[in-house]
């Protein structure tokens, strides 16, 4: 089964997957992929544009291949803000959509703590889209200790 985990930056999408995925499951997480492909000592969130380009291509290839094995393993895919085309594709695959949203105040504090000001715009867009009728929270997660 395909499990698509959505939510704003800093919501706890990776934590949700760590709590639910089994060792045999496939996890496609752009942030983890970037960290795995970056050089030693790389920042966990601030990556060079060339690295991100490579990681995005690798992510697409991983998604394409993983979709061929949904009858054998569960595939956890982080997709922060899937647009209509992606949501329709996930629906055709009978994906389960999980939205992780601990609340805007908590998310904004986590993004500030990560010192990633560029993510503030993504958080704003995510909540704006949600208020317009986009994704609805399925999972409320309390704040976690870092």
Model features per residue range: what roles?
Residues 2-4:
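Short hydrophobic/aromatic beta-strand immediately N-terminal to the Walker A/P-loop
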Residues 7-13:
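Conserved glycine(s) of the Walker
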Residues 16:
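Hydrophobic positions on the alpha1 helix immediately C-terminal to the Walker A/P-loop
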Residues 19:
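Active-site signature of alpha/beta-hydrolase-fold catalytic machinery across serine-
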Residues 22-92:
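Conserved nucleotide-sensing/catalytic segment adjacent to the nucleotide-binding pocket
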């Amino acid at each position: 089964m395909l499990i698509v985990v959505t939510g704003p930056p800093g919501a706890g999408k990776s934590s949700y997957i760590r709590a639910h995925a089994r060792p045999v499951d496939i996890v496609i997480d752009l942030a983890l992929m970037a960290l795995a492909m970056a050089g030693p000592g790389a920042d966990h969130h601030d990556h060079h544009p060339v690295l991100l380009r490579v990681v995005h291509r690798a992510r697409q290839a991983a998604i394409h291949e993983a979709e061929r094995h949904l009858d054998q393993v569960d595939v956890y895919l982080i997709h922060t803000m899937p647009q209509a085309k992606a949501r329709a594709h996930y629906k055709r695959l009978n994906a389960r959509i999980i939205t992780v949203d601990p609340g805007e105040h908590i998310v904004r504090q986590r993004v500030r703590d990560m010192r990633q000001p560029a993510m503030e715009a993504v958080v704003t867009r995510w909540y704006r889209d949600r208020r317009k009728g986009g994704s609805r929270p399925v999972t409320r997660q309390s704040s976690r200790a870092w």
